[in-house]
Amino acid sequence: MAEFSGEPRGEGRRIVVVASRFNEGVTVPLAEGAVSALVGKGVAFDNIDVLWVPGAWELPVAVRRALSSERYDAAVAVGAVIRGDTPHFDIVAGETARGLMEASRDFDVPVTLGLLTTDTLEQAEARAGGVHGNKGADAALAALEVLDLFDRALPANDYDEDGE
């Protein structure tokens, strides 16, 4: 049996961070955490692009457009959807996550989820550099780890377009 895992190594990588402006008191620290984590693991600052979109709903289309350029090894999506009094939260959170997953699958590129879905602003702040860490940084490290895993165990030329 072979067992593989990756390490968050950033040397030579080009990463796009796509961030939602809505709830910017939370999303700015998430984006900053992602960039800081990437640089801390060796991604050159000039190899990181940050794209700001109006809200979480726009994250998937911006990620898709970025990946279609073939300039990036991975995408890190960060945003914050905070529950309100209407079902809007469920629609935005679920469909945004689905759209990001589909972009990852369609482009065969890691797209990591730094999208907070919380009941309160305080819960979001706790996950954007507060007592629960920075989920933007966590998502950035996950992207690098998956890229390294792919390099070690799953090179792109080892399977055809159908994943076989």
Curated annotation (Swiss-Prot):
Its annotated pathway reads:
Cofactor biosynthesis; riboflavin biosynthesis; riboflavin from 2-hydroxy-3-oxobutyl phosphate and 5-amino-6-(D-ribitylamino)uracil: step 1/2
Matches recorded under InterPro entries:
LS, LS/RS, LS/RS_sf
Q: Tell me any Pfam family this protein matches.
A: DMRL_synthase
Q: Which reaction does it catalyse?
A: (2S)-2-hydroxy-3-oxobutyl phosphate + 5-amino-6-(D-ribitylamino)uracil = 6,7-dimethyl-8-(1-D-ribityl)lumazine + phosphate + 2 H2O + H(+)
Q: GO biological process: any one?
A: riboflavin biosynthetic process
* A single Gene Ontology CC term: riboflavin synthase complex
Q: What does this protein do?
A: Catalyzes the formation of 6,7-dimethyl-8-ribityllumazine by condensation of 5-amino-6-(D-ribitylamino)uracil with 3,4-dihydroxy-2-butanone 4-phosphate. This is the penultimate step in the biosynthesis of riboflavin.
Full protein name: 6,7-dimethyl-8-ribityllumazine synthase
